[in-house]
């Protein structure tokens, strides 16, 4: 039996799609030096090569892929989007606007200078910024504005060609820029990070190892009574001195949870809750021959919960104002927009921030009720909310405006992005509404993106050889300019106009470019994770602005003429 693989793939679009995805994902794992190609560029290269051989898939798959991707981008941005937009994140908002607008202006200017069409220009912008949201926004707007089928097909082919040619240029140049720009600017990022650390009471070099607190019980002897000197627990401040807190006291056979007025007496048996290293550092007056093993004292359930910040008495307040240790709880991590932040007592909490808190179950529940809610640890997605807001996004995308003789539609990209932001925002405020496990959200987003890239590459592959011959070197040079010049502009704006700390500034610049590999290099250069504060500040808003940039560049292009 002879099987013609080409005929098999041509006759089965689903099989072709998954073959492209599998080969592209394998290619994406390859490295050029320290730079990994990545899934997006791997799938795009494979689909372009197969597209040259006249393989194709139904455009409905491409459209569904981009819709799923952009909707999930909105859901991820939603919890922190409005807090960044309206509050003290104005510096980060301005940096993101400067980055995206300067890149768009440069792309428009270079496109007109070299006589390219809007497809090549928008593709070059998307690739240089290593931003799939730009590609998605531009592709959707092209389908709205170009009514002639031949012109639309050519523009879409050029869009994917421009992206494919400049993506690696944008990624590699930004990674090298992250490594060498601080040195060229004579910026001492470790010193800048230490300055922020001193101002905010952080240890910039620490890599926190997270443990569950442990419970140990001790009998109060003369040494401990002498150490306490008749002070009550509030006055002693045991947590500040030991890193542990007293959860229970047994006195004269009676077990109780002490309040701040309790005074230690000889013969008391106390249970202490704290991290293992805190127990190891206890003063000998606690430990020497005094440890006891009592089921009632030790029988407590220690939990580690993810608490979502929601309530007004926590939002826009400093972390230190929560006084978690006064409530017998320990803070392990602070997560914002899926980015782990340095544990900074002066950090201002945003709605939707996730605090990883451990302690005795009852105390953790009390803290959660006070500041927000415990995140649902469920693998079940609220598909009804997902579908309802997806439909809402499509309906919003149908809205059109008319200015004189010019019609402008919001489009599916902007509509779905807005609906996704609203779903993410509502999820951060209502614990039982619209729940989507992070793993499921990431999977749908990545799958949608890969399907979109496969469709784009297959449709554009037939014209890639001609396009390379006409624009190859010019496109690479233009991509390098659009990749690096906005980074320099952002640095000058942040340093001289906003007067930002350099460690935070470089982190914010990488967030505005939504480039995690470059962020890792900045953190390594600073020998600290403090730049993550800046990265988180610009990341969510930049994803939204980049999608809008893809839409705007297509709308502005015919207005410029030429």
Curated annotation (Swiss-Prot):
Residues 202-288, 290-373 form the RCK C-terminal domain. GO terms for biological process: potassium ion transport. The chain crosses the membrane at residues 8-28, 32-52, 66-86, 94-114, 158-178, 383-403, 406-426, 440-460, 473-493, 503-523, 540-560. Keywords: Cell membrane, Membrane, Repeat, Transmembrane, Transmembrane helix, Transport. Gene3D superfamilies: Regulator of K+ conductance, C-terminal domain (3.30.70.1450). GO terms for cellular component: plasma membrane. It comes from the Bacteria. InterPro entries: AAE_transporter, RCK_C, RCK_C_sf, Transp_YbjL_put, YidE_YbjL. GO terms for molecular function: monoatomic cation transmembrane transporter activity. It is a multi-pass membrane protein. It is found in: Cell membrane. Belongs to the AAE transporter (TC 2.A.81) family. YbjL subfamily. This is Putative transport protein ETA_21820. The lineage of its organism: Bacteria, Pseudomonadati, Pseudomonadota, Gammaproteobacteria, Enterobacterales.
């Amino acid at each position: 039996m002879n099987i013609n693989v080409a005929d098999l793939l041509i006759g089965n679009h689903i099989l072709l799609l998954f073959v492209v995805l599998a080969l592209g994902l394998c290619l994406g794992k390859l490295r050029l030096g320290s730079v990994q190609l990545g899934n997006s560029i791997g799938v795009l290269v494979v689909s372009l090569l197969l597209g040259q051989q006249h393989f194709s898939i139904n455009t409905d798959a491409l459209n569904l892929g981009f819709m799923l991707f952009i909707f999930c981008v909105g859901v991820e941005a939603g919890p922190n989007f409005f807090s960044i937009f309206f509050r003290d994140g104005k510096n980060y908002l301005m940096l993101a606007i400067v980055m995206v607008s300067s890149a768009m202006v440069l792309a428009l200017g270079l496109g007109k200078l070299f006589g390219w069409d809007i497809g090549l220009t928008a593709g070059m912008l998307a690739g240089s910024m290593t931003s799939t949201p730009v590609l998605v926004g531009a592709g959707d707007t092209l389908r709205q504005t170009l009514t002639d089928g031949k012109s639309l097909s050519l523009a879409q082919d050029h869009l994917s060609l421009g992206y494919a040619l400049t993506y690696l240029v944008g990624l590699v140049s930004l990674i090298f820029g992250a490594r060498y720009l601080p040195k060229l600017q004579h910026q001492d990022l470790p010193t800048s990070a230490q300055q922020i650390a001193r101002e905010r009471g952080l240890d910039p070099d620490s890599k926190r190892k997270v443990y569950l607190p442990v419970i140990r019980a001790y009998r109060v002897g003369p040494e401990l009574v002498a150490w306490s000197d008749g002070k009550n627990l509030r006055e002693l401040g045991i947590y500040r001195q030991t890193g542990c807190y007293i959860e229970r006291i047994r006195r004269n056979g009676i077990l109780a949870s002490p309040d701040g007025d309790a005074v230690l007496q000889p013969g008391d048996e106390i249970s202490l809750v704290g991290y293992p290293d805190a127990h190891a550092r206890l003063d000998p007056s606690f430990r020497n021959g005094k440890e006891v093993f009592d089921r009632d004292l030790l029988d407590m359930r220690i939990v580690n919960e993810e608490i979502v910040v929601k309530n007004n008495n926590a939002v826009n307040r400093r972390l230190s104002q929560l006084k978690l240790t006064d409530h017998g709880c320990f803070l392990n991590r602070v997560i914002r927009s899926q980015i782990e932040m340095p544990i900074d007592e002066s950090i201002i909490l945003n709605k939707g921030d996730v605090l990883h808190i451990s302690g005795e179950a009852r105390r953790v529940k009390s803290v959660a009720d006070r500041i927000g809610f415990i995140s649902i640890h469920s693998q079940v997605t609220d598909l009804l909310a997902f579908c309802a807001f997806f439909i809402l996004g499509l309906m919003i995308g149908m809205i059109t405006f008319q200015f004189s003789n010019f019609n402008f539609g919001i489009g599916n990209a902007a509509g779905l992005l807005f609906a996704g932001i609203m779903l993410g925002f509502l999820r951060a405020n209502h614990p039982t509404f619209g729940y989507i496990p992070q793993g499921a959200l990431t999977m749908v987003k990545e799958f949608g993106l890969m399907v979109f890239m496969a469709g784009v590459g297959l449709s554009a592959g037939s014209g890639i050889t001609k396009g390379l011959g006409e624009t190859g070197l010019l496109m690479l040079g233009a991509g390098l300019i659009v990749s690096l010049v906005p980074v320099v502009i952002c640095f000058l704006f942040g340093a001289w106009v906003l007067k930002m700390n350099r460690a935070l500034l470089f982190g914010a610049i990488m967030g505005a470019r939504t480039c995690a590999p470059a962020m890792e290099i900045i953190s390594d250069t600073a020998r600290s994770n403090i730049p993550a504060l800046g990265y988180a500040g610009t990341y969510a808003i930049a994803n939204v602005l980049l999608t809008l940039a893809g839409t705007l560049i297509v709308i502005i292009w015919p207005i410029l003429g030429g």
